[in-house]
């Protein structure tokens, strides 16, 4: 064995030996404890403060509120977080022993500087970690009780809430503050870490912003066996923070390959809402971006306001996409939208064959429409589904009466008035219990039962 290999083996062994397991239990822990199974810490934020690169944090069941109930956690070290343990750590069943981030509106004034519930940002004054292997598994995120919803507008009679409200507007009858409007998972655009990061067996529900918005520098991002339900704008996207060497517009330098590989597999992505309640833009289940090679397969992608998969961000030659073996259903405008210069093509699954080789698409095989809707019987909330399928948006204009508009009309100037909009529903809260029923709905496709 040569000296270089010996040195590398020694370094890896030293890293593995130094990595610690830290245990956290809201009910049984204390922040002065050692962080062992027998003497766990009480709070996730305390474990993150104590942790070092390479450590694994094990979370018992409970709703973790963040430091001073700020409802976000700064992750500035290359750690892993595993949830779903019983209170005594004797077993791990994530859907039975739920490790949750479920913020309350009462604490939205304490949200601090975190842009995401999990805000990943390494110290910019230090060299970013290389060769990381960060794993996040068995976590449940729900923003449904931190949001503010209109008391009456956009409220079908059989739903719990009215339409979602973007700040500064809020429901002054029931809430203290506006919606937090934060990401669920966010990593800073200046992130320069390399290596692997993964999210598995987790649920992302009721977010008023992009649920999964991860910037990565170089390496592999994996999102597997997760449920994305009732989020706003985009369910999941990965971005590359490394610059692309270019020899001209839409012309990467010869030999260039994407620095980030993203595998998005066996996830269920439903009810991604538009940016505004006019249902006009965004509302993408999944989006690929420049600098990323995406392998999107075996997912269930449906009921998104605009499209299931969006490929319009950035030039086609600066990203690559494999879109294979997915099940699409009832996305309102299209199953895929992509740039076919100079326009945007909106395509249903039965037209995918024409898209191979277009806009960075390497492969687009074996995708299909949902054949048996019965798989979702008892899995989808029927009231929410019915209202979603029948919802309409309308607007009416009432022009101001009087001499001003009379003179404007004579001179050919725009008339003044009031526009009133109406949307039957928009981002109303989805019951978390029903979202978790989506695990295991369809054998082999989408999120499977967590074992």
Give the ranges of each region predicted by the language model.
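Right-handed parallel beta-helix/beta-spiral solenoid domain characteristic of secreted/periplasmic
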Residues: 79-174
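Acidic, glycine- and Ser/Thr-rich low-complexity intrinsically disordered tracts
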Residues: 31, 90-99, 104-108, 168, ...
